[in-house]
Curated annotation (Swiss-Prot):
This is Large ribosomal subunit protein uL16. The gene is rplP. PANTHER family: 50S/60S RIBOSOMAL PROTEIN L16, LARGE RIBOSOMAL SUBUNIT PROTEIN UL16M. It comes from Desulfovibrio desulfuricans (strain ATCC 27774 / DSM 6949 / MB). GO terms for biological process: translation. PROSITE patterns: RIBOSOMAL_L16_1 (PS00586).
Length: 137
């Protein structure tokens, strides 16, 4: 799973995602990518599950780039605990995603194979996505 080595704060406020992605909104490394069209949070487990689904489909060919990194802690209280008495303990990491953000990119395989791999990855994610092809291909 992806996780940061060091963070400034152990617990963050949840916050609210507004607006469109300004950074990471174009296909930069690969030929084809998976772009989010909805706000949401991707946990490190979801990012990894989508990566595995892609890699199993493209087998040994091609290269995959993961363009998001889970750097925000997610907290949870234990089950059957009453509310109050502070914020829960950190249980994992998530990456906040805005519409327009490219999540994954693939290069080195045919576009049809890459499309199918990205579709399989999209089924593992909690946000709606579209497949985008880099201009000039």
């Amino acid at each position: 799973m992806l996780a940061p080595k060091k963070v400034k704060f152990r617990k963050w406020q949840k916050g609210r995602l507004r607006g469109l992605a300004t950074r990471g909104a174009t296909v930069a490394f690969g030929d084809i990518g998976l772009k989010a069209v909805q706000h949401g949070q991707l946990t490190s487990q979801q990012i990894e599950a989508a990566r595995i689904a892609m890699m199993r489909h493209i087998k040994r060919g091609g290269k995959v780039w993961i363009r998001v990194f889970p750097d925000r802690p997610v907290t949870a209280k234990p089950l059957e605990t009453r509310q109050g008495s502070g914020k829960g303990a950190p249980v994992g990491w998530c990456a906040p995603v805005k519409p327009g953000r490219v999540l994954y990119e693939i290069k080195g395989v045919s576009l049809d194979l890459a499309r199918e791999a990205l579709t399989r990855a999209a089924h593992k994610l909690p946000v709606k996505t579209v497949i985008v092809v880099r201009e000039g291909i």
